[in-house]
Amino acid sequence: TRKESSAASDVYKRQAIARFNDEGSEHLLEIWTGTQDPWAMKRFAAMHTGLDEKAIVIYPQRMGGGFGGREHYEVEYDAVCLTAAIGRPVKVQWTRRDEFMAARNRPASAHRIRIATDDTGKLSDWWHAYISGHVIFARDRLPGWLLPVARLAGDDGVVRGANPAYAAPHQRVEYKDVDFPVDLGVWRSLNAAPSLFAIESAMDELALQLGEDPVEYKISQMKGELPRLKACLERVRDMAKRRPLPQSEGYGRGFACGIYEGRCFVAVSADVHVDREKEQITVEHMCCAQDVGMAVNPDQLSAQMESNMAWSVGMALLEQLEVGDDDIKSSNFDNYPIVRMAEMPSVDTAVIDQPAIPPAGAGEVALIAGPPAIANAIRRATGVRALKLPISFADIE
């Protein structure tokens, strides 16, 4: 399978206001900005200006989307430099073109999975090899001389999600780093979503070739210590049954499940319609069940799951960064489409609360299972296995 490069495509563009105050003021430097990490922003500003951190104040603003891209000292750096030079408050705002050219984008990746079973259909061998680029140990976080050393150590972001939830006695996962000619960075779910797209597509195809129900087959092959993942998949299967799938041509339902960071469990179903006359793929309905431990705020958890389903549609069908020989071709939402309201499926969510288990982060968990669920639904609807993201109609003709 293959996942093309993606941009964070925040709806709000990056902007910052900086102001130096007179000596004796409580705060010598004030910065207004939308950032995912105001504490890191304060450290960066202190290192840059030589000021004590206590002399700097960050006023966090609404970001309009972050997804890993609002952790860098970029527009803030420009604003601080300019206000220091002219002695007046300065606002710096990127254009949409700047967003695509200067932001750190998710690298493309390519995956190959080979599976063997015994005579009963039980997994016996699992091999997963893939190539991509570092997203944490990258140019924006490390000096150039340290990058080769970091590549020897490995990058938690790019290996995230590469190990399967399925029990094969013989397993091997291989990764090769690629040095991309552009700046890379984290993107919602890091490399877990591309890896799970490969894993869940392979397991779904194996179940079909064996004549097994994909949900039952996945449950039967799960590692024994994963009852929470099994519960998510069973819950989402039951949720999907409440909405009968049309039996006419072009409709399909797919399932996928996965583990994020070893402690978050999720399963997703997707109902898809493929209209060959209009050459159109439509995701009509999705169900998502998620277990991240104690549900501190169930309503907010559901909102995160719904937003992950929106991004799943974009990742599966729309988002691809166009890169030319010497620059990035994508410049706005006309040539880098994201999901719009008319393309958003209806979504049912289920929060599986575990009061005795400490809560874990839920901002990007469901995204790992959404795209493979959509791809598996397309396989049911058309008989064609889509092997790259995003999936275009030409890929399934």
Regions found by a protein language model. Give the residues of each.
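Cofactor-binding beta-sheet edge motifs in enzyme active sites
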Residues: 5-397
